[in-house]
């Protein structure tokens, strides 16, 4: 029997560090924040296209990817770039977001008849 542990998924902080290292090794430098915001919008649009075709009423064109994970990773990549550029610690930001949503929405969705099956 092996005592090997499965590799752990990287944390948000580790992903932020890996993206920063990649940018400075291969990308020379970050694009401007405004350019990266435009890139993020573009990547979200590409994800929307895949979702519309896979889960909506549209059909795929020849040669289009059917896998939303590629587009989701692209969205996350550019979002991490923006976080790095603007000094946002995504781990702390997510913790604050969970706290805010939990306080604000503690009973909101439980009492929503639209979400009952």
Each predicted region: which residue ranges?
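Flexible "arm" and connector segments at domain edges
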Residues: 1-72, 76-117
């Amino acid at each position: 029997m092996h005592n090997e542990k499965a590799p752990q998924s990287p944390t948000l902080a580790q992903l932020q560090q890996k993206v920063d290292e990649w940018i400075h090794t291969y990308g020379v430098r970050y694009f401007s924040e405004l350019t990266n915001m435009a890139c993020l919008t573009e990547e979200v649009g590409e994800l929307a296209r895949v979702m519309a075709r896979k889960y909506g009423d549209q059909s795929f064109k020849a040669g289009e990817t059917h896998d939303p994970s590629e587009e989701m990773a692209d969205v996350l990549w550019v979002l991490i770039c923006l976080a790095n550029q603007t000094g946002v610690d995504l781990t702390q930001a997510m913790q604050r977001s969970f706290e805010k949503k939990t306080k604000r929405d503690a009973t909101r969705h439980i009492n929503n008849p639209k979400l009952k099956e």
